[in-house]
Amino acid sequence: TKLALESAAALANLIHEKPTLQEALSTYEDDRRLEVLRLQSAARNSLEWFEQVERYLELDPVQLNYSMLTRSQRISHENLRERDPEWLGSAERWFMDQAGLPAEAPLRAPMFTPFKMRDMQLKNRIVVSPMAQYKATDGIPDDWHLIHYGERAKGGAGLVYTEMTCVSAEGRITPGCPGLYASEHEAGWLRLTKFVHTQTDAKICCQIGHSGRKGSTNIGWEGMDAPLASGNWGTMSASAIAWSKDNATPREISQAEMDQVKAEFVTATQMADRAGFDMIELHAAHGYLVSSFISPVSNTRTDAYGGSLENRMRWPLEVFAAMRDAWPANKPMSVRISANDWVGEDGVTPHEAILIAKMFANAGADLIDVSAGQTTVDGQPVYGRMFQTPFSDLIRNEAGLRTMAVGNIYEADHANSILMAGRADLVAVGRPHL
């Protein structure tokens, strides 16, 4: 009704204002398109909340009420403050109590509450997302990385993630990607973590991965995912399926190579510990090597590592477990997953993502970093504000796991709404930090 009335009023006004009907219709379409999409998205979010209301019935009544009020994502934390500051203040006090803050502590927004995983205590719940820099030489982080990550740590976030740090030269996405497979890499990262720990109160996490079939490509601004014009290296994946028609076809990784790469992940994990990282993350998303096993769009194997979800998860879980065993028990470890391939039932679905998250949690994951897509060029993502947060909500509230929301989250208001509603435990923000 709101959409129909507002659209009718807008069209009537334009017909009155414009000299011709065609001009009025053209302007109407341009002006209303974005607002219509926003309203449709809000309506869809609201409908889905009520359809899945059982998911939220175990929430505390305070959080359940907040979740219902903000279900459409049109009403935010600060909107509620304007409407009922007393109630929101009591809700924020409740959240502080859940975070372990004393009753006499000054009132603060959810994003400024502490969060603990194993022995790592974060001062707040804002995370700097992994952002590729393409500035390493032979995998070595240098002054650029020191300044970039040092500035992000000084900026106030509780936790800073590195860009994907690769386990081998062949496992790099581009020639500019950093690594953890040589002593020079370890020394470069140690220099960086020492700065973070001595000059800031942030923690730092190393995201570790292997490019798989998306490797041997140009640095971002020279053509994302485009193959190198020269100096290419061989790539491998779960199956011999090229990323796109322009990329080379990877070789199907053999059992011996799987064992070798798993050992490289362990070596990188040990280096990350010696380099002073507080936390590590296995990158099992976005179509890279580990992700290529999980998604049926890139895994057509007929052995024990293909077919059912349990089979497709076999090697990713072997890698994760080996890393977890090599990583100190008092330090946390997360995993990034693609919770939706955006190709319907042909790929990983949100329902499967719940099972994937549970499997990693059973292997020792302390946090599920919930991303989506980038697993196939055929994906049809539905973009918008906080567009991946519903997957974090799904996994957190149906699997009962700690999650981190990421994806087009760019305001403090977004972060507070996500946290207060119980849609995630941490919120990762990228470009706004820049």
Predicted regions mapped to residue ranges:
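Conserved mid-domain beta->alpha element of the FAD-binding
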Residues: T1-R44
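Flavin-dependent oxidoreductase catalytic cores
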Residues: W87-L434
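C-terminal domain-closing interface element
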Residues: L47-L69
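Sparse recognition of residues in long alpha-helices and their boundaries
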Residues: R44-N45, E411
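Helix N-terminus capping/helix-initiation residues
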Residues: T20, D60-N65, D84, D142, ...
